[in-house]
Amino acid sequence: MTHGEPQEFSFDVEENHGHVPVLRARMAELIAPKVTAMGSDAVIIDGTLGAGGHSKYFLESFPEARVIGLDRDTNSLASARERLKEFGDRFLGIHTRFDRFAPKLEELAQSGNPIAATALEQGISGALFDLGVSSMQLDQAERGFAYRVDAPLDMRMDNTIGITAADVLNTYSHGELARILKTYGDERFAGKIASAIVREREKEPFDTSARLVELLYATIPAATRRTGGHPAKRTFQALRIEVNRELESLENVLPEITQRLTTGGRAVFMSYQSLEDKIVKRYFVDISTSKTPPGLPMELPEYAPKFKVVTRGAEKATDAEIEENPRAASVRVRAIEAL
């Protein structure tokens, strides 16, 4: 992925095939050492439960371990619970934004839930965060994530709370719209698009995706449309990130999950665009670097890093994995281990 390039995975439901979890075997391999060593005390957090594919693979691969699945999307959570009911009390599904899981765990532990209690007492053995929008959400056209299907401009991962994409389009100032399009979508025509949105919403508020896509076709120059992919791709990504506060959630969850890892426990993050990957990389570098003041002849224990990066740079999917699952084409994987 080049610098600033947005997510290659299409928001086009016609291009997304099934619900095969990205790099499932590699994810299991990365968290395996401590999960295997902990046996029945191992608790894995699947921070982005979605359709439950990664959780199912973990429950099958580690027959003694238990899994806590987090999702802010009530539809995804209900579907995953049904899919994973064969695993009984080895699986616990929690409705929450992933950076707000800690208070939920504490509440459940206090009420006697054994998985939550073990997670707090023993620490987390492995954690996975598969960032971005899920295949299930893309397949539900009425959610407004996919740009080739006319639908309400919602885009909320948790459709019970928060602002919608329509709210953003109809209420944000020109400057705010231009900022999110440029920052979150790397859209080179951000200012021009923002001007068109403000002009058109004065005639009639935006409420469906087809009207927005039509505006983008009319606003983005033909030469760019011919070579730059679908003209709606960057704008839809930017709106989705803004509506769901995705980067804020990611920045918040990094310290939340790493401080709860047991010694030897690992946290793995799968990013699909450069903004996410930069946040993960920067945090991992910070917590895995010695804080010993320069000039001292030895490493002082109190300044020694408490984590080590497991992956060499950002791992990418193989051609075989991409063929099986097109979503893997732009994935970047980073993992860290508690020392």
Swiss-Prot record:
MF terms (GO), sorted A to Z: rRNA (cytosine-N4-)-methyltransferase activity
HAMAP family: 16SrRNA_methyltr_H (MF_01007)
EC numbers for this chain: 2.1.1.199
Compartments where located: Cytoplasm
Function description: Specifically methylates the N4 position of cytidine in position 1402 (C1402) of 16S rRNA.
Superkingdom field: Bacteria
Organism in which the protein naturally occurs: Corynebacterium diphtheriae (strain ATCC 700971 / NCTC 13129 / Biotype gravis)
Keywords: Cytoplasm, Methyltransferase, rRNA processing, S-adenosyl-L-methionine, Transferase
Catalytic activity: cytidine(1402) in 16S rRNA + S-adenosyl-L-methionine = N(4)-methylcytidine(1402) in 16S rRNA + S-adenosyl-L-homocysteine + H(+)
SUPFAM superfamilies, per database record: Putative methyltransferase TM0872, insert domain (SSF81799), S-adenosyl-L-methionine-dependent methyltransferases (SSF53335)
GO terms under cellular component: cytoplasm
Cystine crosslinks: none
NCBIfam families on file: 16S rRNA (cytosine(1402)-N(4))-methyltransferase RsmH
Binding site for S-adenosyl-L-methionine: 52-54, 71, 98, 130, 137
Name the UniProt record assigns to this protein: Ribosomal RNA small subunit methyltransferase H
InterPro entries listed in its UniProt record: RsmH, SAM-dep_MeTrfase_MraW_recog, SAM-dependent_MTases_sf
Protein's UniProt keywords contain Oxidoreductase: no
GO biological process: rRNA base methylation
Sequence similarity: Belongs to the methyltransferase superfamily. RsmH family.
Residues making up the signal peptide according to the UniProt record: none
Keyword S-adenosyl-L-methionine among UniProt keywords: yes
